[in-house]
Curated annotation (Swiss-Prot):
Keyword Glycoprotein: no
Source species: Lacticaseibacillus paracasei (strain ATCC 334 / BCRC 17002 / CCUG 31169 / CIP 107868 / KCTC 3260 / NRRL B-441)
Gene behind this protein: rplK
Protein family according to the UniProt entry: Belongs to the universal ribosomal protein uL11 family.
Protein name: Large ribosomal subunit protein uL11
InterPro entries linked: Ribosomal_uL11, Ribosomal_uL11_bac-typ, Ribosomal_uL11_C, Ribosomal_uL11_C_sf, Ribosomal_uL11_CS, Ribosomal_uL11_N, Ribosomal_uL11_N_sf
Length: 141
């Protein structure tokens, strides 16, 4: 018989840097998760993606055991890395802060494909381009 799900926790944590300190510790503690067990597993699983923010969905069962699934980094984080900037524009319609090429957008769309609700790469590219424009990035090509 399948275990009963008690709670689902969604967090965005820097890869390889989960610690019991806030905000991770309190969120996991409220859900009844073994905090040290989760942080060790998460850090081991994401050690190769250093510098990225990794969304994670933690499923907590009634017996206080848990499973977690890591997702691909948010499109905004991948776009900032591709453009080489710290943050997007405060006024994206008037002030452009960076440029990204269609090739960079396609690469990000292919990376994000498994997490996006898109039928093909072109649809995923349009989603990523929309994110880029809303951050004040210019899409070339």
């Amino acid at each position: 018989m399948a275990k009963k799900v008690a709670n689902i926790v969604k967090l965005q944590i820097p890869a390889g840097k989960a610690t019991p300190a806030p905000p991770v510790g309190p969120a996991l503690g409220q859900a009844g998760i073994n905090i040290m067990g989760f942080t060790k597993d998460f850090n081991a699983r994401t050690a190769d993606q250093a510098g990225m923010i990794i969304p994670v969905v933690i499923t907590v069962y009634e017996d206080r055991s848990f499973d977690f699934v890591t997702k691909t980094p948010p499109a905004a984080v991948l776009l900032k890395k591709a453009a080489g900037v710290e943050h997007g524009s405060g006024e994206p319609n008037t002030k452009k802060v960076a440029k990204v090429t269609k090739d960079q957008v396609k690469e990000i769309a292919e990376t994000k494909m498994q997490d996006l609700n898109a039928a093909d790469v072109e649809a995923a590219m349009r989603m990523v381009e929309g994110t880029a424009r809303s951050m004040g990035f210019e899409v070339e090509g």
